[in-house]
Amino acid sequence: MYDNMSTMVYIKEEKLENVTQDEIISKTKQVIQGLEALKNEHNSILQSLLETLKCLKKDDESNLVEEKSSMIRKSLEMLELGLSEAQVMMALSNHLNAVESEKQNVRAQVRRLCQENQWLRDELANTQQKLQKSEQSVAQLEEEKKHLEFMNQLKKYDDDISPSEDKDSDSSKEPLDDLFPNDEDEPGQGIQHSDSSAAAARQGYEIPARLRTLHNLVIQYASQGRYEVAVPSCKQALEDLEKTSGHDHPDVATMLNILALVYRDQNKYKDAANLLNDALAIREKTLGRDHPAVAATLNNLAVLYGKRGKYKEAEPLCKRALEIREKVLGKDHPDVAKQLNNLALLCQNQGKYEEVEYYYQRALGIYQTKLGPDRTPNVAKTKNNLASCYLKQGKFKQAETLYKEILTRAHEAEFGSVDDENKPIWMHAEEREECKGKQKDGSAFGEYGGWYKACKVDSPTVTTTLKNLGALYRRQGKFEAAETLEEAAMRSRKQGLDNVHKQRVAEVLNDPESMEKRRSRESLNMDVVKYESGPDGGEEA
């Protein structure tokens, strides 16, 4: 019997385990309904018994009714208990459903957070990579900045090249053995080139025409940014020359110079310097240590060292180039003056201002002696450089004197001799300083005294001189005079830019082929071997 009962209980438990939660809820609701019905029925019976009990006297029958009433009350209590338990089960079920729903929501939120976490990890990894690349770029840009600062000092002009100087330039006259031509565009340039070329010819080497042609092609490709054509062309020509003439041949050295030019344009200064060192060794071996081509290579090598900030290493190379040019051309040759300018700026970058002053003064003496009047561009540029050197040393009076000389010569070249009615702009500026606040008619100084006409002089050297002298006036507290010169410099620069733009537009419209050739020459001229700082060879105060 007990075995049968245990088996029945086990079967019932197994059945309960197989019942789903929804079925349990449904059956519980049915049980609640049944219990409610029983409760109502028992209440009715109890009321009936109580009414009956009131009508009966105390006897056996009334005792029986009381006993039945007591049983009904117990049944009602059990029904109440069953209803309470059923309601608790329903509440528990609702709570479990809510918990399950919350659980699903939490799981969904966890999945979303996991996805967001993965996305943030990916973003962090990408950001770290970008940061690393940015740091590398910053380091590279710092190096490039140093190079560009020095290149700015090497350039004869910036992109605002004077139209009159553009007109005088002639790339066909540039000596090919100078990787970066260091001769400035000026009258008499052809004579200087012929002197240099003649000196080279007397010492037994002349650059073949085919290499000159290749050089011009490479310059054209480089100006167009087509290095993928220029570099293989140079390397192939170099390989052919080494096969036919051997490595130690002047033509090979020339080809190395041309390839170094391309590397220089790509900012590969170290590779370009290696090529120039090789070219220098070949030229010293084949042409002799005192050949003009050796001087040119030394000069170009000094420039590349300078672009890398190695001024100390560049200085002896520049000095040796100066010695060779003095020996070959004479100590008073204009090319020697140019080399002195280069050497002066190298010393300036090292803070050797006494040597800078000496080199600039000597170069100025050569220019004034050999190039004639005091109005040549080289004289003005060298005076500007010397004035900048004076500023560095605190010799403000000497600098002011030179700046005034430059402006006076420029004014005379444009408007004739100076007199009471025809004064250079610095005189008008000082008059304005003396008379500030005293104009009787209240007219703007832009129309006063005719000083604004000096703005027609659009030489970059004059523009820089105006800025520097204006800064010097400010240092002296002459603010009205400074504003006069600064306004003139601004007008001069704007007029120069407008003229250059008009000329280039006209060239493109009239002769595109000529324009392309001019660009090729311009790319050469913009990288002249000289260490003058600023767009026109003078460092602004």
Curated annotation (Swiss-Prot):
Could you tell me which residues carry Phosphoserine? S162, S459, S520, S523
Q: Which Pfam families match?
A: TPR_10 (PF13374), TPR_12 (PF13424)
Positions bearing Phosphotyrosine: Y448
The keyword Zinc is assigned to this record: no
Primary location group: other
Query: Biased composition, Basic and acidic residues: where in the chain?
Result: 156-176, 495-505, 514-524
On modification after translation, the UniProt record reads: Phosphorylation at Ser-459 by ERK inhibits interaction with CLSTN1 and localization to cytoplasmic vesicles.
Q: Where in the cell is it found?
A: Cell projection, Growth cone; Cytoplasmic vesicle; Cytoplasm, Cytoskeleton
Which BP terms in the Gene Ontology apply to this protein? axo-dendritic transport; cell adhesion; microtubule-based movement; stress granule disassembly
Q: Which InterPro entries does the UniProt entry name for this protein?
A: Kinesin_light (IPR002151), TPR-like_helical_dom_sf (IPR011990), TPR_rpt (IPR019734)
Q: Where are the TPR repeats?
A: 211-244, 253-286, 295-328, 337-370, 380-413, 463-496
Annotated region Disordered: the residues are 156-201, 493-541
Q: Coiled-coil annotation: which residues?
A: 27-156
Q: Is Calcium among the key words of this record?
A: yes
Q: Which UniProt keywords apply?
A: Calcium, Cell adhesion, Cell projection, Coiled coil, Cytoplasm, Cytoplasmic vesicle, Cytoskeleton, Microtubule, Motor protein, Phosphoprotein, Repeat, TPR repeat
Disulfide bonds, paired cysteine numbers: none
A GO cellular component entry from the record: neuron projection
Task: Give the family per the record.
Answer: Belongs to the kinesin light chain family.
User: According to its UniProt entry, what is the function of this protein?
Assistant: Kinesin is a microtubule-associated force-producing protein that may play a role in organelle transport. The light chain may function in coupling of cargo to the heavy chain or in the modulation of its ATPase activity.
Fill in the subunit field for this protein. Oligomeric complex composed of two heavy chains and two light chains. Interacts with SPAG9. Interacts with ATCAY; may link mitochondria to KLC1 and regulate mitochondria localization into neuron projections. Interacts (via TPR repeats) with TOR1A; the interaction associates TOR1A with the kinesin oligomeric complex. Interacts with BORCS5. Interacts with MAPK8IP3/JIP3 and NTRK2/TRKB; interaction with NTRK2/TRKB is mediated by MAPK8IP3/JIP3. Interacts with CLSTN1; phosphorylation at Ser-459 inhibits interaction with CLSTN1.
The name this protein carries in UniProt is Kinesin light chain 1
Q: Which organism is it from?
A: Mus musculus
What gene codes for this chain?
Klc1
